[in-house]
Amino acid sequence: MVKLMKKLEDKKGIIEITFEEEREILELPSKPELPKYASQLINLANIFSQGTRPKVVGQMSELIKEFRKTGGRTFEDWKKWYLQKYPNAIDEATEKIWNMLNNFKETLEQLERDDVRKWVEDLVLIKTYEGLMLQDAILKKVAEELGGNYRPSTIEEESKGIDGVIIIDDKEIPVSIKSKTYVNQEKHLSEELKGHLIIYEKKKNKIIVDYSDLLDLVENTK
């Protein structure tokens, strides 16, 4: 007889159930045996193809509630009920994922080692530097928009939350450059930052920069 539950040695009243034991308790079929890395690849293909999205296989959290209301309990009850309700869903999801795997295969056949090296360089060197220097890029762009110049903040200015200085007509304007997420999370931002706020938000292929606070200041002092 298979031991389904094993007591933990360090504390009474606590047990552990392995995933294999769980499948046996619920009388589920054995976990499918797949080649190495296959599960991860199939899952990735599913993400890209959206094979198991609700529009294809149904909203599972709601379906299981609906199933329980029928009085069904066993896996076979669930399987029969689901396949009657969505007779083509498994095949449709399989087809979507399989097609995406074939797309992966075609791409892999075209890839060369140098392509992988370029990807690694882009991640480790370029994107890391880009993330660190994003504030400088924003500072430069905003200064250009305002017809002025800029300089990086000093160590003392940085300690006050100043990320850079915009220079217009020899007048220095300290600014704080923060992400929209950061601004939304900070309750007392105006009390902590000494510079005029520039807010940025990263989108898929661009960065949205809101310097309206600074623009109002510049226009009102002309």
Swiss-Prot record:
Keywords of this entry: DNA-binding, Endonuclease, Hydrolase, Nuclease, Restriction system
Record GO terms (molecular function): DNA binding; type II site-specific deoxyribonuclease activity
Enzyme Commission numbers on file: 3.1.21.4
Pfam families with a match to the protein in the record: RE_MjaI (PF09568)
The UniProt record lists the keyword Nuclease: yes
EC class: hydrolase
Reaction(s) the record says it catalyses: Endonucleolytic cleavage of DNA to give specific double-stranded fragments with terminal 5'-phosphates
Domain of life according to the entry: Archaea
Keyword DNA-binding part of the UniProt annotation: yes
Entry's Gene Ontology BP terms: DNA restriction-modification system
Biological function: A P subtype restriction enzyme that recognizes the double-stranded sequence 5'-CTAG-3'; the cleavage site is unknown.
Record-given protein name: Type II restriction enzyme MjaI
Organism of this sequence: Methanocaldococcus jannaschii (strain ATCC 43067 / DSM 2661 / JAL-1 / JCM 10045 / NBRC 100440)
